[in-house]
Amino acid sequence: MAKTLYEKVWDAHLVVEPAGEAPIIYVDRHLVHEVTSPQAFSGLKMAGRPLRAVEKTFATMDHNTSTKSASLTALSPMARTQVETLADNCRDFNVRLYDIHHPNQGIVHVMGPELGITLPGTVIVCGDSHTATHGAFGALAFGIGTSEVEHVLATQTLRQLKAKTMKIEVRGKVADGITAKDIVLAIIGKIGMDGGTGYVVEFCGEAIRDLSMEGRMTLCNMAIEMGAKAGMVAPDETTFAYLEGREFAPKGDAWQQALADWRELHTDADAVFDAEVVLEAAAIAPQLTWGTNPGQVVAIDGVVPNPADETNPVVRTSMEKALAYVDLTPGTPMTDIAINKVFIGSCTNSRIEDLRAAAAQAKGRKVASGVTAIVVPGSGQVKLQAEAEGLDKIFLEAGFEWRLPGCSMCLAMNDDRLEAGDRCASTSNRNFEGRQGRGSRTHLVSPAMAAAAAVAGHFVDIRVHRPLED
């Protein structure tokens, strides 16, 4: 029987499917951070249960860490408690921890892949909604709740209903300067923030194959923003080249066997999806959001949409509410929207490729007057590589702030947050009301678009606003 990529991974991990109950699947990798794990570890302790698979559990500190100092004294009391509690729990259960002093510490969805923890064909879970990032490697990866975190810690399994399948094909090649962020925002703009609800999405097509692993991670990271359970890209030579030699990737004969297995991880030619969506890559322009969800997005050469043009009353009301919150007027050219904050980072866009793209726009220019711009690498490894390439100097000379790794301004959970009324060009994944701070307005863009906005003081079309020549 022909199968999709998702069905192959699902079937390989199905432990039991009791009649009338949710199936139980096996979990290969469990990623843990300081925010959603304390109650789970506490539950184990109270029940006197051991950790089922220490070697398959990996922890880091990212959500509440400071990007200005690696000292615990830089943290708020709540953040310090969470960080210290994670350290205590990892010590008590012998879990591998990448703490704030470890050179590989970073955002869980950045450091996991770069260490080779993320592998094709595996099932990966984490108490974080953007776990879908790891699907870029052909893994089935999704976020879970705290009670499920405890269940996985105790059993290395999870009750899970099987999802429907959706194929999203991006045909042809994108134009110069168009990134994975533009592709995924265009997809969400087409199908809506609930278009993928109930599905595991497989991204395919020439434009997807052309993406680097960094780009594929950006793509899958935002699968949750279209409502999908997970996003996946079938592994290929690009995947294998990225993984070879990484710390937790197979070595020697095991690597050769893994390659043979991974090359079978693709959707069979005659497999049938429950739903299919097609986009033409050449039609995708640089994207940016205008409202309060990722589906409220337009091209940079467009204008703020008018709710009066929307025939669906529910959608129209949502648009009106969003425009009132973000304080924009219908018909305003997107390039006329001024910003005063820029955030380049997050599990969506904080990898080395992202920082290179942003630095290309920043090089030889200066951050506009009245604009504060910060760059937060996604991990210690990314930070070191960027500094070895001199990217930090480019940012600093242009007037950007260069920070330590962490989730930072993606969410108003740490000290990096916006003030009421701030308007931010952000490379993160969510533009909900208050996401980056109470009363803040967020516009989601690619790293190049964010850096270009920082130096211009407003949104610009990077197809015109090109990097300066050396």
UniProtKB/Swiss-Prot annotation:
Keyword terms of this UniProt record: 4Fe-4S, Amino-acid biosynthesis, Branched-chain amino acid biosynthesis, Iron, Iron-sulfur, Leucine biosynthesis, Lyase, Metal-binding
Enzyme Commission number(s): 4.2.1.33
The reaction(s) this protein catalyses: (2R,3S)-3-isopropylmalate = (2S)-2-isopropylmalate
Chain sites annotated for binding [4Fe-4S] cluster: C347, C407, C410
Family: Belongs to the aconitase/IPM isomerase family. LeuC type 1 subfamily.
Subunit composition and interactions: Heterodimer of LeuC and LeuD.
Name of the molecule in the record: 3-isopropylmalate dehydratase large subunit
Gene: leuC
